Amino acid sequence: MKTKVLSALFAITILLISCQETNIIKNLPDGSSSAPAVSGFFKKNVLVEDYTGTWCGNCTRVSWAMKEAEAISDKVIPVAIHNGNDPYHFPGIAPLKNLILPNSPLALPVSRLNRMEVWSFPETSNVQQAIDLTSNNTTIGIAMNSIVANGTIDLDVKIKCLEDYANLKLVVYLLEDKLYFLQRNYNLDLYNGENPIVSFEHNHVLRASLTDILGEPIGSINEGETVEKRFQIPIPTVTSPPNFSNIPQINPENISFVAFVIRADDNKAINARASHANENQNFQVNP
């Protein structure tokens, strides 16, 4: 009888240990750029940050490559960050420069994919590198809703996760399109070899960062949870850089937003989303 009792207790102990060590393994879908969409998962977009300048004759190479990438995929999120003797110089560029090139000067053009990955030279021959960072299937999604009116911005950014995430940061940019200015062009095979390009249309130009440009901590997000960040601010004013006067203020009709989530440990963007002003978005969920 004693032996039977001991055997039963041993069996119960093994059962308890087994239960404690059980791990639930989730089968996540293929996240490669060519994989078919799986219902319920989010689209994954690639963030392209183009450090550029109107004075930079080689910078047209990157702007051309971005347009080629956009023509291939609707999951490309471009941002043009102007620097130097430029009417659209972004004065808050220093933290970004120190992040991506801590020991080197910012010799333009410079381009980064998902904030930290170098876009291989020449970018026009490596468009697929950017496309390969997109996917039909990821577990974190972004949606934005905005009202831009009467000189003010009311913007909601929502982030939803299909698995647990930790140590996340959010970056939100305000961009402006349809800015026309002379652009130097040293690439004779691009833009018909015109140099300079008169009234070049500059789009996706970074005008303000609504968060810390290196990211605002949002901590952890649990599976199935949605977090929301709201911005209620006046449309930012811009100051004319040295050597330029009377640079127009931001045109509300040409405003757009880019929001992206980065991992705090390596500063890599894990998803991004672009939105026009006064657009109400749903999450990019596969049907």
Task: Provide a role label for each language-model segment.
Residues A37-V76:
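Local sequence-structure signature of Cys/Sec-based thiol-disulfide redox active-site neighborhoods
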Residues P29-A35, K44, T60-R61, E68, ...:
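Membrane engagement elements in two modes
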Residues V79-P287:
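Short, conserved sequence motifs used for protein processing/export or organelle targeting and
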Residues T22, D50-G57, E194-H202:
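Short N-terminal helix-initiation segments at or just after the protein's N-terminus
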Residues S18, W55-N58, K160:
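The N-terminal extracellular segments of secreted preproproteins, especially immediately downstream
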Residues A8-F10:
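Exposed, low-structure sequence patches enriched in small/polar residues
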Residues K2-V5, L15-L47, V285-P287:
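Bacterial Sec-dependent N-terminal signal peptides
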